[in-house]
């Protein structure tokens, strides 16, 4: 028979144990913090000072908008004006002496010269008047844009209504805006904040014109690309680019209601070039060439075709600047077009077709 051990329940000696109560086993309740007030105010960090904001977003928001140069006093203009008066007096004395000599020879010669002088003066006055009205139309568009910027900061609908009325007058000759004008007329009795009303006018009236402006820019860029690729001489490229850019800027101004004359066109071209020079966009140079011709495209493009693509993109950039200047409202409700929007149209897939299929 086996002897009992110490752990055998029949032979274990009695012992004392300490039992914990339920109150001790449960964790003590957390004391609630008494309400307190803080003196420090919440500070908001501006986007330009936020180090965690994407730099691309900051650059896109800070993209400069084309604005016309303000006319300033110039001694050159003063000198040209004085010379113009002097030559006008000289022409008047010459015409008077000529007509007197013709009358001394024969009356019908004198009357013919007088009628010719009157017709010439009338034509010159008509040309001057047309140029003045063209410049006034351009100034009216720029004044409307500046007033729209101010009205967009005011919540009151009254300034915005005045902007919409002026915008309707500027674009009344465009049939594409008829539907938008009717839609805005239906909102005359609605309660709309000033900024929202201006954005609504931009969507209804300017979006159809923006589509046409994009088509104008794209078609001009494609023509410049093709002519540059096939032209035998660089002087032909330069002449055609100047012609195409001038036609594009004029078409852009007429699209948005500017309709400038010759002097107004020269002023508009000067403003476009000044905007490109300020933003640094006129020097597309090596950076844009590497962007377009990189990623294996350089081996597939000839040198002339590459130059055509570069000139086409440069034409598109000039068209975007002209669009900025001629548009009667700033870009708020819709996205401002960029050079990247035309990149895919001017640089198709060279691997064979648009879908990448081998020809």
Swiss-Prot record:
Membrane-topology descriptor: Multi-pass membrane protein
Q: Which GO terms describe its cellular component?
A: plasma membrane
Checking InterPro entries in the record gives: DUF697, UPF0283
Q: Please give the start and end residues of each transmembrane region.
A: 75-95, 108-128
Transcription is among the record's keywords: no
Where does the record place the region Disordered? 1-39
From what superkingdom does this record's organism come? Answer: Bacteria
Where the protein is mainly located, per its record?
membrane
Q: What are the protein's UniProt keywords?
A: Cell inner membrane, Cell membrane, Membrane, Transmembrane, Transmembrane helix
Localization annotation: Cell inner membrane
State the Pfam families in the record.
DUF697
The text of the family note is: Belongs to the UPF0283 family.
HAMAP family xrefs = UPF0283
Show the PANTHER family listed in the entry.
Answer: UPF0283 MEMBRANE PROTEIN YCJF
Q: Which NCBIfam families does the annotation name?
A: hyp_HI0043
Can you say what this protein is called? UPF0283 membrane protein Atu1356
Lineage of producing organism: Bacteria, Pseudomonadati, Pseudomonadota, Alphaproteobacteria, Hyphomicrobiales
């Amino acid at each position: 028979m086996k002897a009992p051990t110490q752990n055998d329940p029949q032979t274990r000696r009695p012992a004392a144990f300490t039992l914990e109560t339920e109150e001790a086993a449960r964790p003590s309740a957390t004391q609630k913090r008494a309400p307190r007030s803080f003196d420090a105010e919440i500070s908001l960090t501006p986007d330009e000072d936020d180090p965690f904001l994407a730099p691309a977003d900051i650059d896109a928001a800070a993209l400069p908008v084309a604005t016309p140069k303000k006319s300033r006093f110039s001694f050159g203009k003063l000198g040209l004006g004085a010379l113009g008066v002097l030559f006008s007096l000289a022409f008047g004395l010459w015409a008077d002496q000529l007509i007197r000599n013709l009358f001394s020879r024969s009356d019908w010669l004198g009357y013919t010269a007088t009628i010719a002088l009157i017709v010439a003066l009338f034509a010159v006055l008509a040309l001057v008047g047309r140029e003045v009205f063209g410049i006034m139309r351009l100034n009216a568009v720029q004044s409307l844009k500046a007033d729209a910027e101010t009205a967009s900061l005011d919540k009151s609908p009254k300034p915005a209504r005045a902007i919409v009325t002026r915008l309707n007058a500027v674009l009344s000759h465009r049939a594409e805006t008829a539907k938008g004008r009717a839609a805005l007329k239906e909102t005359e009795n609605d309660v709309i904040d000033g900024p929202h009303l201006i954005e609504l006018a931009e969507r209804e009236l300017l979006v159809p014109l923006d589509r046409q402006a994009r088509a104008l820019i794209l078609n001009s860029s494609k023509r410049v690309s093709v002519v540059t690729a096939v032209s035998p001489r660089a002087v032909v490229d330069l002449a055609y680019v100047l012609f195409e850019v001038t036609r594009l800027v004029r078409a852009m101004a007429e699209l948005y209601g500017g309709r400038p004359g010759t002097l107004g066109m020269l002023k508009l071209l000067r403003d476009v070039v000044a905007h490109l020079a300020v933003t640094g966009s006129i020097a597309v140079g090596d950076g844009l060439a590497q962007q377009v011709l990189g990623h294996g495209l350089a081996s597939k493009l000839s040198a002339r075709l590459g130059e055509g693509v570069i000139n086409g993109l440069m034409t598109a950039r000039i068209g975007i600047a002209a669009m900025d200047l001629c548009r009667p409202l700033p870009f708020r409700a819709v996205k401002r077009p960029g050079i990247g929007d035309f990149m895919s149209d001017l640089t198709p897939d060279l691997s064979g077709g648009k879908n990448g299929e081998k020809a």
